[in-house]
């Protein structure tokens, strides 16, 4: 299923943008897509951790979005 999420890169370049993608992707792939979309020069931190701001939960890069419970409208802060 495709979901619309907001990506927050405040720890890197400060940008916030929306993505529409499959919830079958692992968190690590979502971070790779965000890096390509925003041309971020610094590499992501080890482990590819994210925080789902509106649900106050933290997940590692190995978890699939669907397994993490990430759905439409969630805001992902890349740590």
Swiss-Prot record:
UniProt cross-references to Pfam families, sorted A to Z: YukD
Phenotype upon loss of function: Cells lacking this gene are blocked in YukE secretion. They display an increased bacteriophage SPP1 resistance phenotype.
Function comment: Required for YukE secretion. Probable component or regulator of the ESX/ESAT-6-like secretion system (BsEss).
UniProt family annotation: Belongs to the EsaB family.
Name this protein carries in UniProt: ESX secretion system protein YukD
């Amino acid at each position: 299923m495709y979901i619309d999420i907001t990506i927050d890169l405040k720890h890197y370049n400060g940008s916030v943008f929306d993505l529409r993608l499959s919830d079958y992707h692992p968190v690590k792939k979502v971070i790779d897509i965000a890096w390509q979309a925003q041309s971020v020069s610094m590499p992501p931190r080890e482990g590819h951790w994210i925080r789902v701001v509106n649900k106050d939960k933290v997940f590692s890069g190995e978890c699939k979005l669907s397994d993490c419970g990430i759905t439409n409208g969630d805001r992902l802060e890349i740590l």
